[in-house]
UniProtKB/Swiss-Prot annotation:
<keyword id="KW-0564">Palmitate</keyword>
<dbReference type="Pfam" id="PF13145">
    <property type="entry name" value="Rotamase_2"/>
</dbReference>
<dbReference type="InterPro" id="IPR027304">
    <property type="entry name" value="Trigger_fact/SurA_dom_sf"/>
</dbReference>
<dbReference type="InterPro" id="IPR050245">
    <property type="entry name" value="PrsA_foldase"/>
</dbReference>
<keyword id="KW-0697">Rotamase</keyword>
<dbReference type="GO" id="GO:0005886">
    <property type="term" value="C:plasma membrane"/>
</dbReference>
<keyword id="KW-0449">Lipoprotein</keyword>
<protein>
    <recommendedName>
        <fullName>Foldase protein PrsA</fullName>
        <ecNumber>5.2.1.8</ecNumber>
    </recommendedName>
</protein>
<feature type="domain" description="PpiC">
    <location>
        <begin position="144"/>
        <end position="237"/>
    </location>
</feature>
<dbReference type="GO" id="GO:0006457">
    <property type="term" value="P:protein folding"/>
</dbReference>
<feature type="lipid moiety-binding region" description="S-diacylglycerol cysteine">
    <location>
        <position position="22"/>
    </location>
</feature>
<comment type="function">
    <text>Plays a major role in protein secretion by helping the post-translocational extracellular folding of several secreted proteins.</text>
</comment>
<feature type="signal peptide">
    <location>
        <begin position="1"/>
        <end position="21"/>
    </location>
</feature>
<dbReference type="InterPro" id="IPR023059">
    <property type="entry name" value="Foldase_PrsA"/>
</dbReference>
<keyword id="KW-0732">Signal</keyword>
<dbReference type="GO" id="GO:0003755">
    <property type="term" value="F:peptidyl-prolyl cis-trans isomerase activity"/>
</dbReference>
<feature type="lipid moiety-binding region" description="N-palmitoyl cysteine">
    <location>
        <position position="22"/>
    </location>
</feature>
Amino acid sequence: MKKRTIATGLVTLLSIVTLAACSKTNQNSKIATMKGDTITVADFYNEVKNSTASKQAVLSLLVSKVFEKQYGDKVSDKEVTKAYNEAAKYYGDSFSSALASRGYTKEDYKKQIRSEKLIEYAVKEEAKKEITDASYKSAYKDYKPEVTAQVIQLDSEDKAKSVLEEAKADGADFAKIAKDNTKGDKTEYSFDSGSTNLPSQVLSAALNLDKDGVSDVIKASDSTTYKPVYYIVKITKKTDKNADWKAYKKRLKEIIVSQKLNDSNFRNAVIGKAFKKANVKIKDKAFSEILSQYAAASGSGSSGSTTTTTAASSAATTAADDQTTAAETTAAE
């Protein structure tokens, strides 16, 4: 299931690094004084600039500025507000405290969302350029068409086993059993092999069932609490796979692009390409290695950190996907 992360915010650090990297005059500004000594902005900057968090903060600031300049007109305020409202709805009354605990204001979080959406736009556009007939055919081989299913979700394995026995009994009314026992209100789902509306274990097991087939108990993990969750699935609608991949061309394209979005190497390459176009240069030796992963991914031959794009995209903006930090929301996009 797709997620938006309220990343462990580097907003305060971003402000600090920006403040500390100002002109020499400002660097001499006093932060604190004491008998016989002072602490200046420059003192503070020199103290914090070598930390991993500071490097991530500078990297995030670079990503935000570069992508805003190159793709700023591609993401509307309406899109950002929609994603923000979905996150707020997910968290409910605890949303403000979730933001505050990570050093965010509401506007900070909207900026995070915007930066991530700018990156997503760029990655999608680059991914579309690379799609060939060979790409479609490869995706088609693994593709399983959409099915419709009745789904029972339970928190207890013992309860799941008991419900399964009832569901597999002769003449059982699976729809009623699902309605009476499932956690939550929804019992009917439609999905294919590229869907994210159910855990991957459930999708895999369900898509291998025949029409009217009932699964065994499928164990998965709750994406927010990480506690075990148990599923029972019955397929109510299933069609044979068309022999012509072109029948699924639109859906295959969506799946290919989605896979690229989740490919950290591809994302790094797109970010690296944007940095190159912007002629980004690092002037402070303390931050000399922060672009290495993007240079390597974009084919410049540089070697460097294998840190995922979370530092750049999610910390600047998710992690989501997902990612991930302790605070997440299933704000679907």
